């Protein structure tokens, strides 16, 4: 009979699984990533996988949550550096920081394509509170920072979604993408923030 994993082994295996899932999320995508791929890379059997996660989808949701925390941390850091600036500048810094962090993590396609499909594997309440679309998450962070808008929330959210989806075209636009994105974010915040 196989020996159970020690707590230290469990932690190490769990981290290896998450690391492999991160790799596949940004390269292959969730749908094309098999349980065999994840377990082989982590050095465990398929049956052992279920001692760590009840499904492949829940593993990917956990790394989505980790990435969400990284984006939130980056935005919170940008808030610290924008103390004393007006709300339009603060909002622009927050939105731009969220976009650049998402790009730096390489997770735009994962968030746009895979995360909405994964959200169906969790209860609706939990999906709303944690696994938000990135645009909704950015919008919620602006509200949390007490940024007030001149337009209805639906219009603000749509503007954030349009800006967010532009990240997908970064390679087509080339090296001027981020300076142009910054201009668009600042312009949108000038119009939308009270």
Each model region followed by its residue ranges:
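N-terminal intrinsically disordered/low-complexity leader segments
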Residues: 1-12
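Alpha-helical structural segments
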Residues: 16-23, 27, 41, 58-78, ...
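Ser/Thr-centered, proline-biased regulatory motifs
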Residues: 30-40
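Short hydrophobic/aromatic patch on the recognition helix
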Residues: 43-53
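Hydrophobic alpha-helical connector segments
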Residues: 62, 76-104
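Amphipathic alpha-helical packing segments from all-alpha helical-bundle domains
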Residues: 72, 76, 119-157, 179
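Short linear capping/connector segments at secondary-structure termini
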Residues: 111-120
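Hydrophobic/aromatic-rich alpha-helical bundle segments in the mid-to-C-terminal region
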Residues: 143-188
């Amino acid at each position: 009979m196989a020996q159970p994993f020690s707590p230290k082994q469990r932690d190490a295996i769990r981290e290896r699984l998450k690391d492999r899932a991160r790799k596949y999320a940004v390269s292959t995508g969730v749908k094309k990533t098999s349980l065999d791929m994840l377990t082989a890379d982590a050095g465990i059997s398929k049956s052992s996988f279920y001692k760590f996660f009840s499904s492949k989808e829940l593993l990917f949701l956990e790394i989505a949550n980790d990435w969400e925390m990284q984006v939130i941390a980056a935005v919170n850091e940008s808030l610290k550096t924008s103390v004393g600036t007006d709300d339009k500048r603060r909002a622009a810094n927050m939105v731009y920081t969220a976009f650049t962090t998402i790009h730096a993590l390489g997770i735009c396609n994962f968030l746009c394509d895979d995360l909405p499909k994964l959200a169906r594997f969790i209860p609706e309440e939990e999906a709303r509170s944690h696994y938000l679309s990135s645009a909704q998450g950015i919008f919620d962070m602006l509200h949390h920072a007490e940024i007030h808008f001149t337009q209805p929330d639906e219009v603000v959210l749509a503007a954030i979604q349009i800006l967010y989806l532009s990240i997908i075209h970064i390679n087509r636009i080339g090296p001027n993408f981020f300076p142009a994105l910054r201009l668009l974010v600042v312009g949108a915040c000038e119009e939308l923030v009270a």
